């Protein structure tokens, strides 16, 4: 809504228009929406702009073309393969962006491998939020110093699939524990996914996740062994340069004493925290973003 893109249609089979207005107006993380939001003529109006609303469970039934929607963000977390996401094309969509990792769709991370995009691709994946933070971080280090190997930990804010109180979770026993008062170890494919967008790092990175009881903003903790010896000041300078140059808007550099809530609503993919990183020796370093 704050870009030059026109949001012309939304599909949600689970809530009605009145509830959409309520959910958009009030948010437990971002606060109350400062603009206007209402229903009129069977549409959702935000800041005096109409948005057509569909309520279809099967994406093949969504008439995107009738609303003038050309580029679809597939964010259900259900239709994440090329075949499943391609169902949107039936209704008149031209391109589909899956907002999650995909088993087979080409994967792209802004600032990292968009140069490999081919206009013939109709369905692409934008990877995960963690990969969007990690991949630019890894790219800067690998381009400048070379990465031999690395381990990543993400300290991840609560997600909608977690449980507020202990409950059954047959596939992930720890995932069934209450998110309100636990630090919950979990798996993540984010580090391995970096190998898909930076092929030379394939097999060199892996990682895990800790789910913590915060509402928003997550942390990537990347420990790497680098090929070319460097001081931490030299590594910081590489990130400072990237944030002002080729990765401006993707990576941001901070040298202030910030905490997680200071980044709520931030638009950068990865904010390099220069004060939080540490170095053991010239080839072994921990980076925080």
UniProtKB/Swiss-Prot annotation:
Q: Which GO terms describe its cellular component?
A: cytosol
Would you say which domain of life the source belongs to? Eukaryota
Write out the catalytic residues in the record.
129 (nucleophile)
Per its UniProt record, what SUPFAM superfamilies does this chain match?
Glyceraldehyde-3-phosphate dehydrogenase-like, C-terminal domain, NAD(P)-binding Rossmann-fold domains
Please list the reactions this protein catalyses. D-glyceraldehyde 3-phosphate + phosphate + NAD(+) = (2R)-3-phospho-glyceroyl phosphate + NADH + H(+)
The main place the protein resides is: cytoplasm
Q: Which GO molecular function terms does the record list?
A: glyceraldehyde-3-phosphate dehydrogenase (NAD+) (phosphorylating) activity; NAD binding; NADP binding
Transmembrane feature ranges: none
Q: Which residues form the signal peptide?
A: none
A biological-process GO annotation = glycolytic process
Identify the enzyme class: oxidoreductase
Q: Which InterPro entries is this protein grouped with?
A: GlycerAld/Erythrose_P_DH (IPR020831), GlycerAld_3-P_DH_AS (IPR020830), GlycerAld_3-P_DH_cat (IPR020829), GlycerAld_3-P_DH_NAD(P)-bd (IPR020828), Glyceraldehyde-3-P_DH_1 (IPR006424), NAD(P)-bd_dom_sf (IPR036291)
- The record places the site described as Activates thiol group during catalysis at 156
Q: Which Pfam families match?
A: Gp_dh_C, Gp_dh_N
Give the record's keywords alphabetically: Cytoplasm, Glycolysis, NAD, Oxidoreductase
Q: Oxidoreductase: present as a keyword of the record?
A: yes
Indicate the family of this protein.
Belongs to the glyceraldehyde-3-phosphate dehydrogenase family.
Q: How does it assemble?
A: Homotetramer.
Q: Which NCBIfam families match?
A: GAPDH-I (TIGR01534)
Protein name in UniProt? Glyceraldehyde-3-phosphate dehydrogenase
Organism in which the protein naturally occurs: Amanita muscaria (Fly agaric)
Gene encoding the protein? GPD
């Amino acid at each position: 809504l704050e870009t030059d893109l026109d949001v012309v249609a939304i599909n949600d089979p689970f809530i009605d228009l009145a509830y959409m207005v309520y959910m958009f107006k009030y948010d437990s993380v971002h606060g109350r929406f400062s603009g206007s939001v209402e229903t009129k003529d069977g549409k959702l109006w935000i800041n005096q702009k109409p948005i057509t609303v569909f309520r279809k469970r099967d994406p093949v039934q969504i008439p995107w073309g009738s609303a003038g929607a050309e580029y679809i963000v597939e964010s259900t977390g259900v239709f994440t393969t090329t075949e499943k996401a391609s169902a949107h094309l039936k209704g008149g969509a031209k391109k589909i962006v899956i907002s999650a990792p995909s088993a087979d769709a080409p994967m792209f991370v802004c600032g990292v491998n968009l140069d490999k995009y081919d206009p013939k691709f109709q369905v692409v994946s934008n990877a995960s939020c963690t990969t969007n933070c990690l991949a630019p971080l890894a790219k800067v280090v690998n381009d400048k110093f070379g990465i031999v190997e690395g381990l990543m930990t993400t300290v991840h804010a609560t997600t909608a699939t977690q449980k507020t109180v202990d409950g059954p979770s047959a596939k992930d026993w720890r995932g069934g524990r209450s998110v309100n008062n636990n630090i919950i170890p979990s798996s993540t494919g984010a580090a391995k996914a970096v190998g898909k967008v930076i092929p030379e790092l394939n097999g060199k990175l892996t990682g895990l996740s800790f789910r913590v009881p915060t509402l928003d903003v997550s942390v990537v903790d990347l420990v790497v062994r680098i090929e070319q010896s460097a001081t931490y000041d030299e590594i910081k300078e590489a990130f400072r340069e990237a944030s002002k140059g080729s990765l401006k808007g993707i990576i941001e550099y901070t040298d202030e004493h910030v905490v997680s809530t200071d980044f709520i609503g931030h638009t950068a993919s990865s904010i390099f925290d220069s004060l939080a990183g540490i170095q053991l020796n010239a080839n072994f370093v921990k980076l925080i973003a």
